[in-house]
């Protein structure tokens, strides 16, 4: 099985397969409540994480929200 290449936060990353954004977030062990996702220059709403697919050549930016004072 061949891997797919994506760009995640400006760096090449290889995934075992095509997956949706929710699966990628889970694989990266991120808290879905504390991130924002952009795919191919478009913001992905959290209610679309199961529908939006991460495929060969996808460009994603994932931003973490950090609390502080």
Pin down the residues of each PLM region.
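Ubiquitin-like/PB1-type beta-grasp interaction modules and other compact soluble beta-rich domains
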Residues: 1-68
